[in-house]
């Protein structure tokens, strides 16, 4: 930070966390990396969060209090709406970008078993096309490295192949981007670019078998009907793909229903791909064509740094080298606290808090979820409900005791069956800000 320069926001100030502690709270940091809050500094932090802090001595150095840091995307320009205004969608969704429209779900609206359609996050790369008046006449083209190219109307797709229905998580690659330091470019998602829905459709594998994959088939090239923001019909908004092996996974679906109802326009009506466990951009909306290629697809959204991460760690804030990247496929382990909401106030004298949430990790499954009320000094295991399938999220519940009134931070972290655990700090910095899966933290005030 340049000498004499004033920071304009709490995010900018905490670009140098220990300096921020000193400026705001007068906190000194020891070798344990947990700060010492005393006298005026302790009073200042208490005033900032609105209550005394029972576990103040445990606060890690440079920690932005959760009441400020979590679930609050950076504000857009004054002309941008901060809450969503879109038919069929919950107005409490938070807009993180308006061109194209992108909106995330507050954690408390994510649901338990499934995320309601109206609360499901929105991720677009271009415009949202109108839903067709006669959806069953929508045609999906299958071509490329196949023996029998197909043009299948949706109505025929529904009757020609076995219908499947599965609860599966979709998550944007940028979920958690707001927690990278220094900031990475892109929509500043916090925890809500994710949702779990029950998807109904047919296996893509069954359709590709009907088309007859050639031995040269390597990768899919998927396309949708979303218009480019420029209005130029010759420009493609997005065209991503997957290896043929993932396309043939029995859980990869061509879906036309979401939570028992036909897809609505923001979620890809009338037909979309659902590629569970992989980054959300692979689950193309408004799907109208799948071309099978004899090499890795190089369409829009497959080159440069788009949906790619460094092969080796790079210095945070550096430009990176496009040649030293790999395609980002799966998402890391993550948990979220769905209740209570961040910033909840409980009645004076409350001495226990009931928690609920969910955790997921691609197809690896969840081994355990742990929660803490004392800034991570001690942890307690949550109770896990069994998932309903390999790509469902694991719902969890827990109860934590609280010693007194005051300000608490409830932290949650998950560990998957491969042994990976959510980190406290996003250590996998990359230019596009993919895969930040830090602990979920919420603030709770008692009294």
Regions from the language model: what does each represent?
Residues 17-19, 45, 58, 66, ...:
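Short, intrinsically disordered, low-complexity terminal segments
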Residues 35-63:
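N-terminal export signals
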Residues 4-8, 19, 39, 71-78, ...:
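Intrinsic disorder/low-complexity segments enriched in polar/small residues
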Residues 25, 55-63, 68-72, 151:
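N-terminal export/assembly segments and adjacent metallocofactor-ligating motifs
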């Amino acid at each position: 930070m340049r000498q004499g320069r004033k920071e304009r926001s709490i995010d900018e100030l905490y670009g140098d966390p220990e300096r921020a502690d000193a400026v705001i709270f007068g906190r000194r940091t020891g070798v344990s990396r947990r700060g010492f809050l005393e006298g005026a500094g302790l009073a200042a932090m208490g005033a900032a969060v609105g209550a005394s802090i029972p576990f103040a001595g445990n606060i890690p150095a440079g920690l932005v209090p959760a009441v400020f840091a979590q679930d609050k995307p950076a504000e857009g320009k004054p002309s941008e709406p901060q809450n969503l205004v879109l038919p069929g969608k919950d107005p409490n969704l938070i807009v993180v970008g308006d061109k194209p429209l992108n909106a995330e779900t507050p954690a408390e609206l994510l649901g338990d078993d499934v995320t309601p359609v109206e609360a499901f996050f929105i991720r677009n790369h271009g415009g949202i096309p109108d839903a067709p008046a006669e959806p069953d006449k929508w045609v999906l083209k299958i071509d490329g490295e196949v023996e029998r190219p197909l043009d299948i109307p949706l109505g025929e797709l529904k009757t020609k192949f076995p219908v499947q229905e599965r609860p599966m998580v979709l998550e944007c690659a940028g979920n958690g981007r707001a927690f990278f330091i220094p900031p990475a470019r892109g929509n500043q998602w916090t925890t809500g670019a994710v949702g779990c829905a029950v998807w109904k459709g047919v296996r893509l594998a069954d359709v590709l078998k009907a088309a007859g994959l050639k031995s040269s088939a390597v990768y899919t090239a998927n396309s949708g009907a979303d218009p480019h923001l420029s209005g130029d019909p010759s420009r493609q908004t997005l065209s991503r793909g997957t290896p043929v092996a993932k396309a043939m996974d029995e859980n990869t679906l061509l879906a036309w229903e979401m939570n028992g109802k036909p897809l609505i326009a923001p979620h890809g009506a009338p037909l979309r791909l659902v590629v569970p466990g992989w980054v959300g951009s692979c689950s193309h909306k408004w799907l109208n064509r799948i071309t099978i290629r004899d090499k890795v697809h190089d369409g829009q959204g497959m080159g440069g740094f788009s949906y790619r991460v460094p092969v080796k760690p790079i210095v945070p804030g550096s430009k990176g080298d496009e040649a030293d990247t790999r395609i980002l496929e799966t998402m890391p382990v993550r948990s979220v606290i769905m209740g209570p909401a961040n910033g909840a106030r409980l009645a004076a004298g409350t001495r226990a808090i009931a928690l609920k949430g969910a955790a997921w990790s691609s197809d690896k499954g969840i081994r355990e979820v742990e929660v803490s009320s004392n800034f991570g000094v001690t942890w307690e295991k949550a109770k896990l409900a069994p998932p309903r399938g390999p790509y469902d999220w694991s719902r969890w519940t827990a109860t934590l005791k609280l010693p007194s009134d005051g300000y608490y931070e409830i932290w949650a972290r998950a560990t998957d069956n491969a042994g990976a655990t959510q980190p406290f700090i996003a250590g996998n910095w990359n230019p596009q800000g993919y895969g930040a899966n830090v602990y979920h933290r919420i603030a709770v005030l008692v009294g």
